[in-house]
């Protein structure tokens, strides 16, 4: 989500729709991304067909700044995402072209081999110290190597860090002198 922060901030004066996200949206996290709580709209659907219909309506209306859609994550679906048919993807792509709405579709990595009408398709994978962004499909020349994006300090600081103890000997507390022992006994 942090990758989308600049784009979402640019449209934060309009509604930002989160359609069937895998987890309940966290207001503080959305605020950190630049989305005011009043601009966030969380939509859930019981069936994938209902979610696809809602996505198409949001895109065609042009009334929202952005649509973030996780297809197959309906309230009655299993833990595994259901695939979206190619004709449904084509309809969403056409609706996105007609409207003035940013459209982000989040799908599992297993679907990166499937065809899609989207002009830009990215794969995001964790990497030590950041993330690797793969270019599945883009306009222009093919890029084989993923783009490494380091994580900012603020996100790594939030996680507990394990650090080894220094190898030098720690000072041992001094033993109380006889005079101090006498004072303690008195």
Protein language model regions, located:
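N-terminal regions of ATP-driven nucleic-acid and macromolecular assemblies
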Residues: 1-186
């Amino acid at each position: 989500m942090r990758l989308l922060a600049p784009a979402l901030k640019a449209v934060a004066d309009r509604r930002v729709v989160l359609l069937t996200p895998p987890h309940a949206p966290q207001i503080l996290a959305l605020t950190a991304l630049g989305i005011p709580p009043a601009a966030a709209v969380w939509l859930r659907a019981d069936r994938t067909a209902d979610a696809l219909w809602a996505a198409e309506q949001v895109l065609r209306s042009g009334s929202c700044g952005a649509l973030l859609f996780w297809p197959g994550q309906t309230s009655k679906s299993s833990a595994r995402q259901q695939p979206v048919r190619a004709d449904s993807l084509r309809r969403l792509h056409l609706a996105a072209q007609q409207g003035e709405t940013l459209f982000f579709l989040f799908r599992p990595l297993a679907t990166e081999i499937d065809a899609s009408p989207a002009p830009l398709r990215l794969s995001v994978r964790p990497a030590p110290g950041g993330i690797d962004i793969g270019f599945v499909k883009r306009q222009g020349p093919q890029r084989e190597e993923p783009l490494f994006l380091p994580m900012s300090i603020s996100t790594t600081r939030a996680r507990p860090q394990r650090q080894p103890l220094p190898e030098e000997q720690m000072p041992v507390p001094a033993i109380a002198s006889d005079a101090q022992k006498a004072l303690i006994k008195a």
